[in-house]
Structures are given as C-alpha cells and as structure tokens.
Amino acid sequence: MANILKKIYDNDRRELKKFEKLATKVESLGDEYEKLSDEQLQAKTPEFRKRLKNGETLDDILPEAFATAREGAKRVLGLYPFRVQIIGGIALHYGNIAEMMTGEGKTLTATLPVYLNALTGKGVHVVTVNEYLSSRDESEMGQLYKWLGLSVGLNLNSMSADEKRDAYNCDVTYSTNSELGFDYLRDNMVVYKDQMVQRPLNYAIIDEVDSILIDEARTPLIISGQAEQANSEYIRADRFVKTLVEDKSDDDVDDDEDHGDYKIDWPTKTINLTNQGIKKACEHFGLKNLYDIDNQVLVHHIDQALRANYIMLKDIDYVVQNGEVMIVDSFTGRVMEGRRYSDGLHQAIEAKEGVKIQEESKTQATITYQNFFRMYKKLAGMTGTAKTEEEEFREIYNMEVITIPTNRPIARKDLPDILYPTLDSKFEAVVKEIKERHAKGQPVLVGTVAIESSERLSQMLNQAGIPHAVLNAKNHAKEAEIIMNAGQRGAVTIATNMAGRGTDIKLGPGVKELGGLAVIGTERHESRRIDNQLRGRSGRQGDPGVTRFYLSLEDDLMKRFGGDRVKLFLDRISDNDDDKVIESRMITKQVESAQKRVEGNNYDTRKQTLQYDDVMRTQREIIYGERMQVISEDKSLKPVLMPMIKRTIDHQIDMYTQGDKKDWRNDQIRDFISSAITDEETTKKLNMKHLSAEELKKRLYQIAEDNYAEKEKQLADPEQMLEFEKVVILRVVDERWTDHIDAMDQLRQSISLRGYGQLNPLVEYQESGYRMFEEMISNIEFDATRLFMKAQIRQNISR
C-alpha cells in the first residue's frame, strides 16, 4: 500500500514539475503581450486558428494561447491569472482534475484551457451544477471570450430547440450537467437529422466535478412518456381474440387449408394468426390490410392479446390476487411483488382477467452521468476536494487528480473534533460557541448534514436572540447572495450540506483582525470530501480562519461506525454527566477511518452500477449508431433493409425446417410467408412440397426483390422512397428499443433474486442481456420485414 501511495505521490510531483515548466514559459511571454495593442492581441485568435489548420497542435500553441487569454483577462475582467492558476489551467488542458482550494479562482483558471481548446471550433462545454452558476459565469467570463473573437452560448432548460442548437454551435457553451445529458438523449430520439441540437462531444470542463461525477454518478437521466396505448385498445383486442378458434391440425396434414384462426408452436411459445384469422381481424376491425403501416399498434395489441389468452397460463405463469395480476417466478414458484411484464403483455393479461388495467409510463431513453461524460473526447474537472476520491477518478474516468499549490500559504486553523455524549449537549455547546464568537463580531458559518438539524439549531439561535440566515438548496440565486454575505462582520449562517457551492465567501472589513471566518460542523458527513468542502469555506487566499467539528455519540456516523475505542469513552462518562466532553485527535482519526470504510463501500456500489450500466451502454451505442445512419442517409436505405428481410427469411425458414422434410412445420411456414412476405395467393403457388429449404429461401428472396422494385416504381420520386424506408425502420426500432429498455430494467431488478447457487449476478445479467438484445434485433428485422413487405404505398406518410 505504501508503495502505491508513493507511486501516486511521485506521479503527482512529476506532472506538477512538467506543468510548472510550461507555466514559466507562459509567464515569460507576459511582458511581450502586455505591449500589444488591443487589435494585435485580438488578432491572435485568427492567427492561432490558421496555425492549427496548418498542422500545429494545441500543445504547440499552448504557451502563446494562455498568454493571450491571460492578458485579455487583465484588460477585460481586470483579473490577471496567478502562476498557480496557469498551472491549474494546464492540468485542465491535459484532461486532469485540478484540485484547487476554495477562493483560488477556479472560474478564472478555466478561461485559459477553454480559450485554447475553443480555437479548434469543435466546441468546449463548461459544465456547472445549476443554471444560476451557468448564467453567472457565461455573462462574466463570456465577455473575455467574445472580446477575443470567440462565440459564447448559454444552454438553458427553458430554451427552444433552435436556441439550444445556436448555443451548441458556439465555440464555448455553458450548461448544467443534466441539460447536456437530456439533450443527448433527445437528440437520439429525433426523426429528422436537422432536429438535433448537439454536435459531437469534444471537450468538457466540469466545475465541482466531484459533485457531478461521484455524488450524482448513479443518478440515471430518464426520459419517459405515458405508454401511448389506451386501455380501451387492450379491451378491444382481447374481445376479438376471445372469439378465435385454435388450429390444432397436424403439420403433416398437407391440404393448404386453415383449420382455425391461430396456431401455437409450443416449443418456441410463439403464436400467430392463420390466414383465416387475418381475414377475421380485417372483418372485425373494418380493415383492408391488417399489416398496413397505420395498423402497427393494433397488430401489437392483437399479438399480445393472443399471448395473454392462449400462452400465459393462470396459476402457472401468473396469479390474480386482490384484483391485481402478479407474476410467478418460474425458478422459485414465488409471487414476484411489484414486477410487471413489459411490452404491454401485463395490460393484455389484465384485460383477459377483467381486472383494472394499470397505466404505465415507459422509459424511452436513459443514461447515467458516468456513461454520458465518458463519451467526451477529452474531459477535465475542477473542485476543492477530489484527492479522497482519486482512485475512482483514475479507474472510472481515466483522470488524474492534480493538487494545485495555493497562491498564498494557508493560515486557517483546523481544531480537533469535540465529542459530546448526547445530541442535546452537543447542540447546546454549538450555540454557546456561536454566541461567544458573535458577541465579538466574528462571522460564523455552521454546517449541518440534514435539514432537520439546521431547523433545530435555527430554533435554538432564535431563543438565544442571535440573528442568522438559513440556507438550503431551494433558491440558487438567493443562496448565492446569502453565502456572499456570510463573511461580513456579525453574520451567522446555517448551511445544509454545503448549499452554495461555487460562490465565494469574502471577508468583510475588520473581519481578518477578528480571526477570519469561523466554521462549525455540527456532525461529520459520511464522506470526508464533504467535510473538507465545509472546512475550505474558511481561510481563502491565505486569510485567517478557524474550523471545528462538534460530534455526539448519538450522531448517525458514530452510531454506525463509532468503533470500540469510542464506546470505551462512553463507559467512562456516567449516565448523568451530560457535560462531560472529549476533545482529542484520536476521535478525529477514529471518525476518519469510519468515513474511509463508508467511502470504500460507496465506491464499490458505484463501480458495480457502472459494470451493469456498461451492458446497456454498449447496446445503446449500437442502436443510436444505427439510428443515426438511418436519419443521415440521403440516397437509399435498400442496402440496410434488403439484408434485414433476407436475414428474417433465413431465420424463420431455418426455425421451421429442422430435421427431415416430414418434420417440417408447414403451417408455420405458410403463416409466416402470408403474414410477412406476400399474399395468400402467391403463398399457395409456391408449391413448397417440391422445394428444399434453400430453394424456398431463394424463391422468397426473389419475391422480396420484386416487391421492392414494385414499390420503387410506385414511388417514382427517390426522396419519397427514402422517406418510406425511414418511416418503416424508425417506427420499428423506436418501439422495440423502448420495450427493450423496459425489459432490461425488469431483468436488472430480478437478477439479484437469481443470485443463488454459484451464479454471479453480473455475469447472469450480461449473458441474459446479450440474449435479449439479439432477440430484439431479430424482432426489429421481423417487424421491419412485415411492415415493408405488406404496407400499401401512399403519398402522405409521416415519421
């Protein structure tokens, strides 16, 4: 362990040395650039762009570009980045995390790598945790970029698609993390390419990177829509299906006649309408062609009603309890609480059983921040606290944490923790300390872990007659204002879990002489990082300050991980002695080792989440890639559709022609051909009994080719044909992908229940997920084949 730590430390030093050399180069250009006129300095931007076009790299022009942005900042913002800020900027350019203490000017530091990377014209995203900070930074720092000839955009939740597109087309775009993620998902749901708003993800600098990539890492972004099927549709389909008769005739009976309306193939648990059944459906619903493109939703309902009524067996596959359909686990025979079949099958069973059909919202697209931000070509981040999570940043995001030295030595005093036996005695002591410091005018910031603690403390301060402000993360703009005033003489501010990150606490007049800002933590958070954030609010830029944590044996963390040694202290304190107090570095160490254990557990959970998510990520990339190919195509999708049709023919014919010819499942073959490839008349003329499986496939390929040619003739305009092809593929892909997301979610929930025996749940999930994905692709190809081959051509199709 010691060796690993030494290696990390040495690597940190080595990187820092390299960055310091570069910073010296940047500083050495300072005098020369100071002498340039505004016009000459502004002319640097087109000059750099030209040099990049001619083959120079960003690394080649870094010293000059940084010197340009630095001099520009002095002229436009009245701020001149210090040497440590240049080093921080270099760390960011190389895709690292710059750990910079609060008040060291992270926002200004970012301007240097943002300017350099924006010169490529491929876009730089500056990512913040809320829209207030995005707007603030865009209006303040944006002045500098605009002055240097770059375009700057702000991406807000309230904007229209056109406004968003304009923002993303800028050289520099300010946005929140959630808006970036949702825009990415929405872009992969559009049906026309010009509806997309984002460009390829190039370079992002994330402010408060630990908050976004670690605290919110497991939060999935989800776009969901009400499942569009109305309940009445399930009932309509159910009523129709209940009138049908099963065709139980043997496949050996070769009379080309249907002996019922539907046929079940029990080995594969598939069920299909026969030609007789298709005719009945057309009569029942008043249709000319059941498989026309407009009837896709109805066909889906009929398919599910058939499965619900004739394949899914009551008291074997499911039970009905208290008016609800409950799934039975085929492995254990137990009822699975809260689980539902996906793809509308559950509603179809509810219709069959005459119970209330439950509305369902459907996840249409989803991604986690972990997977979204890993798609950027280059990623960097800034925060005051990342070192404790260094391993996670390296392993998951391939980013090193570089601790940037402070501009001035730290003068803050971090006092040892104080431990009280009870919550009451602890809060009384906190109020006493606030009172003493407030009496002499020293500003106090009190950090609490939970809102209820802040309310309790606020009540006690009211009783003590101490005016104070309470902060919780509801109103970001108001929050910033309160935090800005927290360093004024006599200010007392209570903040929950570091609301107000990203806003500096500057000391008011005469506060330095009083000892700077006093920070009091009312309990330790389970993450050291959050505690360090609270501490870091005091002592900015070499200011004086003091911090201390007050703990009690009734605190959550102490109860969970207090350790035996702390309990010994408790025994020494008699029951009635509430005033007994322990102040010791040992307590601090004990708490920190408890925090390390929690952090380790949390990291393992996030890592596991990512391993599961990676299965979905691979699948999402394939589907989104295919979708993009479809909406970007400007000539013909025949090279995509025709192979789909051929693979469907191969798959279906292979499935039903195994073994000797006498074992062929002729009824199923006929049903497939007449429902998905051609009409009943042509199916009869095929004379299958004289064909081998390969000959039959070739005949069907030819029918498909002829059908394609016929449709191309009907739609003489190639653009209309392309539009028709796109409609077919997009409708099918989107419907099947949405169902697949749902099914994968169900699988993930059930997989933990399967973790019996020696099975590894993750391996089970990967293998089942892969099989389900293959099945989905096969279903997409089947649906696209049926939809394309059976559709009637009309002029006014819409996607």
Curated annotation (Swiss-Prot):
GO terms for molecular function: ATP binding; protein-exporting ATPase activity. It comes from the Bacteria. CDD domains: DEXDc_SecA, SF2_C_secA. The keyword Membrane applies. Gene3D superfamilies: Helical scaffold and wing domains of SecA (1.10.3060.10), P-loop containing nucleotide triphosphate hydrolases (3.40.50.300), SecA, preprotein cross-linking domain (3.90.1440.10). Its EC number is 7.4.2.8. ATP binds at Q85, G103, E104, G105, K106, T107, D504. Keywords: ATP-binding, Cell membrane, Cytoplasm, Membrane, Nucleotide-binding, Protein transport, Translocase, Translocation, Transport. InterPro entries: Helicase_ATP-bd, Helicase_C-like, P-loop_NTPase, SecA, SecA_CS, SecA_DEAD, SecA_motor_DEAD, SecA_preprotein_X-link_dom. It catalyses: ATP + H2O + cellular proteinSide 1 = ADP + phosphate + cellular proteinSide 2. It is an enzyme of class 7 (translocase). Part of the Sec protein translocase complex. Interacts with the SecYEG preprotein conducting channel. Has a central role in coupling the hydrolysis of ATP to the transfer of proteins into and across the cell membrane, serving as an ATP-driven molecular motor driving the stepwise translocation of polypeptide chains across the membrane. PANTHER family: CHLOROPLAST PROTEIN-TRANSPORTING ATPASE, SECA INNER MEMBRANE COMPONENT OF SEC PROTEIN SECRETION SYSTEM. Monomer and homodimer. Part of the essential Sec protein translocation apparatus which comprises SecA, SecYEG and auxiliary proteins SecDF. Other proteins may also be involved. This is Protein translocase subunit SecA 1. It comes from Lactobacillus johnsonii (strain CNCM I-12250 / La1 / NCC 533). The lineage of its organism: Bacteria, Bacillati, Bacillota, Bacilli, Lactobacillales. The gene is secA1.
